[in-house]
Amino acid sequence: LVFRLASFPIHLGLGATAVRQPSIEDKDFFEAYAARHTSDGAEGRLVSMFTFSQPWTVWERHPRGAELVVCTSGTITVHQEQADGTVQTATLHAGDAVVNPPGVWHTADVTAPATALFITAGIGTEHRPRESTW
């Protein structure tokens, strides 16, 4: 019954389903996740938890839906690149949250270990290298 969300994410799908996923440590996790849940389309959500000890090395975006990020411990600084190229920054402490809108590139910085809960429209997620930090 009990499992570690950081190791085994949940898929929230059509029909109010909540399906535990295989280990996120599998190198093919995201590709296999998309294949398993593509029929849920933009309404499916991946619920995951990650602990970070270093700034992200990539930008990412979720073209098919918004992402909720909830800081559960530590401090996380989230950067969102707007369509006009400007960057908005939000610093989250435990209990704070931010929404990454659909299609908005985002990345994050930490200076000490921090943990966040993510609820993501994960199918179609894109990544690009990160060239700078703030």
Annotate each predicted stretch with a short phrase.
Residues 36-38, 56-63, 80-81, 89-90, ...:
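Short histidine-centered beta-strand/loop micro-motifs
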Residues 63-78, 82, 119:
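Short, conserved beta-strand element in jelly-roll/cupin
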Residues 82-102:
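Short acidic-glycine-tyrosine-enriched beta hairpin
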Residues 42-43, 52-56, 73-77, 84, ...:
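Short, charged/polar surface micro-motifs in flexible loops or helix N-caps
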Residues 1-11, 107-134:
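Double-stranded beta-helix
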